[in-house]
Swiss-Prot record:
Pfam families: Baculo_ME53. Residues 1-68 are annotated as: Disordered. GO terms for cellular component: host cell cytoplasm; host cell nucleus; host cell plasma membrane; membrane; virion component. May act as a packaging protein or as a structural component associated with intranuclear baculovirus virion assembly. This is Early 53 kDa protein. The lineage of its organism: Viruses, Viruses incertae sedis, Naldaviricetes, Lefavirales, Baculoviridae. It comes from the Viruses. Residues 31-42 have a biased composition (Pro residues). It comes from Autographa californica nuclear polyhedrosis virus (AcMNPV).
């Protein structure tokens, strides 16, 4: 009898084993104790390996549990398809479908503060969540990274077959995410004692190693959610790039004073009109104050906006609006005004004071991230030097994006979409940065200053 118990490991079975995931599993706390198991040294970490595309599509429906099975799995199973949290791949079934909440013209009265963000911030957050979702599922998809953001609506050249893909691993312990034996959390840990151009400054790690590092002040969650307040810190640490060029979130502030006469006592239409007519794509609205001659009537503001994989991480979504959705945890003053009808008696002029952040950089390229450099990641087209007639190669359909640490001399260059060129050969393509065109554009900018 004792032999049976030892072989089946009944007494030491993990809490998350069995049919489903334990409902009491909490999200990791910032002050959690580090893991007692030390990760292997950096020198032992294997580089990402190129992988083949899956022969079958990702599962989009919950797997049926085995009934009356006499087989006991000896491998710890953490992320079951019928578990407590919704699998990251479940949302792939909604890709390509339009979300009504993303459209400002949608007439249903709702919280409009997600439209306060600038296009720059929205594109970065969406690209980051797309990258982290693929990463937590076990792979890095270069084509997805290239087609996210503004490129999704452009006639961009791409291969009908798969472009470059590679395994995703925890850069601390080398855990392969496709093994799917750990919780669905992904973190960026910044080691601030190392220089900005050091590839070991940033770790993309699993939950276990996040707890091991135990540096909550320089750690940021990127799956299942990413916070707007974290963007400025991650940009400062050079986590966002346009190809090999760092993304800057430098900005100025501005206050706009507006006068609204034809409001018809409809506060929802007032807010929507301000967003549509008085907000530029590179601006983020911080607060909107609506007042009359009698004083302040409403202040619509927020402190944080969260982009989350699912509106409820414990409930499988039925509509596309509940996938990759922006969430505000603070109550909306505008929605409260709709409930108490405080604008119903206002007949005169409404004065609006709009405080905005105006970002100086335009995001017009593919958004990439600082992955660990890999050896022998080149082909006959992009070459070992990653140069095309002395121009830096930014992307190869066979080898993926050029590592952001490969050309440190270009890290201070400005990104111009007009300098992006391509060359095709043998059903493959490279994208490179035309330095002659770049110099012409720089001279034009300097002459206009």
């Amino acid at each position: 009898m004792n032999r049976f118990f030892r072989e089946n490991n009944i007494f030491d079975a993990p809490r998350t084993g069995g049919k489903g995931r334990a409902k009491s599993l909490p999200a990791p706390a910032a002050n959690s104790p580090p893991s007692p198991v030390r990760p292997p040294p950096k020198s032992n970490i294997k580089p990402p390996t190129r992988i083949s595309p899956p022969k079958q599509p990702m599962c989009t429906s919950p797997a049926k549990p085995l009934e009356h099975s006499s087989i006991v799995s000896k491998k710890p199973v953490v992320n079951r398809k019928d578990g407590y949290f919704v699998p990251p791949e479940f949302g792939n079934k909604f890709e390509g479908l339009p979300a009504y909440s993303d459209k400002l013209d949608f007439k249903q009265e709702r919280d409009l503060r997600m439209h306060f963000m600038s296009d720059l911030e929205r594109d970065i957050m969406k690209a980051t969540l797309k990258f982290s979702t693929n990463y937590i599922m076990g792979y890095i998809n270069s084509k997805d990274m290239r087609m996210t953001g503004k490129f999704a609506s452009r006639p961009v050249k791409y291969k009908k077959t798969m472009e470059h893909m590679s395994d995703s691993r925890c850069t601390t312990c080398n855990y392969r995410f496709k093994d799917n034996t750990r919780e669905w959390f992904l973190y960026v840990v910044v080691h601030i004692e190392k220089p900005l151009d050091d590839p070991d400054r940033i770790d993309i790690c699993c939950q276990k190693c996040y707890l091991y590092h135990n540096v909550p002040k320089t750690s940021y969650e990127i799956y299942p959610s990413i916070n707007l307040v974290d963007l400025s810190y991650l940009a400062r640490e050079r986590f966002f790039y346009q190809y090999i060029f760092p993304v800057s979130l430098e900005h100025t502030t501005e206050v706009k004073e507006l006068r609204i006469d034809d409001h018809n006592c409809k506060v929802f239409e007032i807010i929507r009109r301000i967003i549509r007519n008085h907000k530029e794509p590179n601006e983020r609205i911080q607060t909107i104050d609506l007042s009359t001659t009698g004083g302040l009537v409403l202040r619509e503001t927020y402190t944080n906006i969260v982009l989350q994989r699912y509106r409820s991480m414990c409930t499988r979504p039925d509509v596309v609006d509940d996938v990759n959705c922006f969430i505000l945890q603070e109550p909306s003053e505008m929605m409260a005004a709709l409930q108490d009808n405080r604008f119903s008696g206002i007949k005169g002029t409404v004065f609006a004071t709009v405080k905005v952040k105006k970002f100086t950089q335009v995001l017009d390229g593919a958004i990439t991230f600082p992955l660990k450099p890999t050896t022998n990641n080149y082909c006959k087209l992009c070459k070992k030097t990653k140069l095309y007639y002395k121009n830096p190669v930014l992307y190869c359909t066979k080898c993926g994006f050029t590592n952001v640490y490969h050309f440190p001399e270009y890290s201070k260059f400005m990104y111009y979409f007009e300098a992006i060129k391509s060359f095709e050969m043998h059903n493959e393509m490279i994208i490179y940065y035309d330095l002659k065109m770049y110099k012409k554009l720089i001279n034009i900018v300097n002459n206009n200053v």
